[in-house]
């Protein structure tokens, strides 16, 4: 279910403050965050945000096509290591 249009998109306050400060300075630096639930808004475009995936922070460059999505969508938490090998040969 989508979020009500009456409500604003969720963005963590600390993240919003950091982005506004960088926009006023017109500087580019990596913003480190654990807030995977924050929605990408147009003021974030052009910034690099390091999103925590549970183990490390992955730097993600924000483009205009990402607006409206959540930050966590771009930092996968699980790595697929392949299916279990078939051990029929070792059983013989």
UniProtKB/Swiss-Prot annotation:
Coiled coil: none annotated. Keywords: Chloroplast, Plastid, Ribonucleoprotein, Ribosomal protein, RNA-binding, rRNA-binding. One of its GO terms (cellular component) is mitochondrial small ribosomal subunit. The keyword Ribosomal protein applies. Belongs to the universal ribosomal protein uS19 family. GO terms for molecular function: rRNA binding; structural constituent of ribosome. Protein S19 forms a complex with S13 that binds strongly to the 16S ribosomal RNA. GO terms for biological process: ribosomal small subunit assembly; translation. It comes from the Eukaryota. This is Small ribosomal subunit protein uS19c. The lineage of its organism: Eukaryota, Viridiplantae, Streptophyta, Embryophyta, Tracheophyta. NCBIfam families: rpsS_bact. It is found in: Plastid, Chloroplast. Gene3D superfamilies: 30s Ribosomal Protein S19, Chain A (3.30.860.10). InterPro entries: Ribosomal_uS19, Ribosomal_uS19_bac-type, Ribosomal_uS19_CS, Ribosomal_uS19_SF.
